[in-house]
């Protein structure tokens, strides 16, 4: 069978379709699933696609997770989900001047950062997320102190 050559947009649309219909837990599973459809991809490409699509990893029980499309629309939905993620996956919050570092369980930093970005708060200049660490830049030192208190409260529930 011949491999399909898809544009980036077509490939990402296909990823969204698969994620919406199937339980995909890892990048490797997603690579295998696409290859089963004769779409040749590398894990590096899938990693970039996951970041660009801002997919989040949701717990599905027994220590397992699945990728999902972040589809929260209302401010309240975002705040509730952020609280849940902080309670379940954020381990530590630290601050230096107007910068905060949030440490999460492996694989959860991008999901938390996405929700922080979706809040569109004036006191947050921006976020940068890796696998288990989020860098948050607050507008001022005072606002960073306030954010740190708020994040600690979210961790406690």
UniProtKB/Swiss-Prot annotation:
The keyword Transcription regulation applies. Pathway: Amino-acid biosynthesis; L-arginine biosynthesis [regulation]. Keywords: Amino-acid biosynthesis, Arginine biosynthesis, Cytoplasm, DNA-binding, Repressor, Transcription, Transcription regulation. It holds the Pfam family Arg_repressor_C. It is found in: Cytoplasm. GO terms for molecular function: arginine binding; DNA binding; DNA-binding transcription factor activity. Its main location: cytoplasm. InterPro entries: Arg_repress (IPR001669), Arg_repress_C (IPR020899), Arg_repress_C_sf (IPR036251), Arg_repress_DNA-bd (IPR020900), WH-like_DNA-bd_sf (IPR036388), WH_DNA-bd_sf (IPR036390). One of its GO terms (cellular component) is cytoplasm. Gene3D superfamilies: 3.30.1360.40, Winged helix-like DNA-binding domain superfamily/Winged helix DNA-binding domain. GO terms for biological process: L-arginine biosynthetic process; protein complex oligomerization; regulation of arginine biosynthetic process. It comes from the Bacteria. NCBIfam families: argR_whole. Regulates arginine biosynthesis genes. Belongs to the ArgR family. PANTHER family: ARGININE REPRESSOR (PTHR34471:SF1). This is Arginine repressor. It comes from Deinococcus deserti (strain DSM 17065 / CIP 109153 / LMG 22923 / VCD115). The lineage of its organism: Bacteria, Thermotogati, Deinococcota, Deinococci, Deinococcales.
